[in-house]
């Protein structure tokens, strides 16, 4: 397991269910596995609620997997330290190295002994982090520089140059982000940050602490920073347990800052919403489709005293997040309630933790390998990206599509 976000690991319990009978080992770094347990359990709870709702509507359906399947799957998890070669059998040796994307994220080296005894070396990237915005990713490990392999299987989320950013863009956007928060807090407004419970919340806690702990205007007004969500609290505790050495001590110092207020109950959410004083609220989830954030959005979006700042992917065209932040329409329908957009809504794009277009090009150009295979990337732009990279790097590059998903090497 290269990382713990649900789009990478959320269906593992299904493989372990009675229908599928997976009996293998699940290997990953300690941080990845610990976070994954929290995210998978939360995913299962949502899945079960969805099944119950479908049944109440008369649909015949059953869960893809059960809680017992999930716990049985957890028993198959084994911690593998980064930068330690592990021999799985006489044919395969692996090693996890830092991907720099989020807590515990890894790339994996696989050395496969072929029948003729030669070694075929594969590197699979998972999601890779960017060096362009380390300023706003204080916990990110430095991505390992890879130089040589036979096959590199690469993500390419930022496969359009027009979507990319550089260090200058990051600096300007972060300054605007801080100015927007300061200006609107001093105007008595409530600021909502829809965030994902994993990684984004924890990094914002550090960013706010480093920026605001000694700011006179902030401390004089005693503005609270609300962290609202059960899952974000559980994952923050994983960070407290699994960060190492100075990072662990510093993160615990941040979490003990008296301006941070943690809420884990819906009654607490209602109490927070009843207050009119200015504050910063971080609530999950980032897509604004469900979770505590929906209640805050419904209250703040229609108010001139509300501010909503998005700092990551908020869903595709037609989603609630897109309708709020990107659509020119003046109203949004949320849970059958039509809301006129009166709040200030701003989107920031440089907070992404993905490697950027120019960094991918530089990586591919400097990599000595027989083939690069583009895998994790948007379908509509993948082929254009591959053609551009072939031209710019003079490398043999292919991409996985629904037409050619089997490769022989």
Features from the language model and the residues they span:
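Hard-cation-handling environments
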Residues: 176-319, 332, 375
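Short acidic-hydrophobic, aromatic-tinged amphipathic segments that line or gate anion-handling sites
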Residues: 75-83, 259-266, 399-401
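A short, acidic, amphipathic alpha-helical segment used as a generic capping/interface helix at domain edges
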Residues: 291-300, 352-367
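Generic long, charged, amphipathic alpha-helical segments
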Residues: 332-363
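Proline-aspartate-enriched helix->loop->beta-strand connector
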Residues: 364, 368-377
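His/Asp/Glu-rich metal-coordinating catalytic cores
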Residues: 1, 5-9, 13-203, 209-218
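Short acidic, glycine/proline-enriched helix-loop-strand junctions
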Residues: 381-408
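A short helix->loop->beta-strand "cap" motif at the edges of active sites that frequently abuts
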Residues: 20-25, 187-189, 221-223, 304-306, ...
């Amino acid at each position: 397991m290269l990382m713990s976000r649900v789009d990478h690991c959320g269906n593992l319990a299904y493989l372990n269910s009675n229908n599928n009978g997976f009996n293998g080992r699940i290997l990953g770094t300690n941080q990845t596995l610990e976070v994954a347990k929290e995210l998978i359990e939360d995913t299962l709870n949502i899945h079960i609620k969805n099944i119950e709702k479908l049944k109440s509507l008369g649909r015949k359906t059953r869960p893809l997997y059960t809680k017992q399947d999930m716990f049985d799957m957890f028993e198959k998890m084994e911690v593998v330290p980064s930068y330690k070669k592990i021999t799985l059998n006489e044919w395969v040796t692996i090693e996890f190295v830092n991907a720099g994307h989020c807590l515990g994220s890894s790339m994996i080296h696989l050395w496969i002994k072929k029948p003729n005894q030669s070694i075929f070396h594969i590197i699979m990237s998972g999601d890779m982090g960017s060096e362009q915005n380390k300023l706003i990713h204080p916990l990110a490990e430095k991505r390992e520089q890879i130089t040589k392999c036979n096959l590199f299987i690469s993500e390419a989320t930022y496969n359009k140059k027009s979507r990319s950013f550089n260090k200058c863009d990051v600096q300007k956007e972060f300054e605007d982000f801080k100015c927007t928060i300061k200006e609107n807090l001093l105007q008595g407004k409530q600021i909502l940050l829809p965030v994902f419970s994993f990684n984004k919340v924890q990094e914002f806690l550090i960013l706010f602490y480093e920026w605001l702990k000694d700011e006179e205007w902030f401390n004089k007004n005693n503005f609270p920073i609300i962290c609202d969500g059960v899952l974000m609290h559980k994952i923050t505790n994983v960070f407290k347990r699994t960060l190492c050495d100075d990072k662990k001590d510093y993160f615990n110092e941040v979490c003990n800052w008296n301006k941070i207020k943690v809420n884990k109950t819906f009654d607490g959410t209602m109490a927070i919403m009843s207050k009119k004083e200015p504050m910063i609220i971080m609530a999950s989830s980032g897509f604004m489709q469900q979770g505590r954030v929906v209640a805050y959005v419904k209250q703040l979006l229609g108010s001139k005293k509300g501010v909503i700042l998005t700092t990551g992917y908020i869903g595709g065209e037609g989603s609630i997040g897109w309708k709020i932040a990107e659509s020119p329409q003046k109203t949004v329908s949320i849970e059958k309630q039509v809301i006129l957009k009166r709040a200030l809504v701003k989107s920031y794009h440089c907070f992404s933790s993905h490697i950027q277009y120019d960094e991918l090009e530089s990586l591919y150009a400097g990599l000595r390998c027989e083939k690069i295979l583009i895998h994790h990337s948007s379908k509509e732009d993948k082929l254009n990206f591959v053609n551009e990279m072939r031209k710019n790097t003079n490398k043999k590059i292919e991409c996985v599509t629904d037409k050619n998903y089997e490769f022989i090497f």
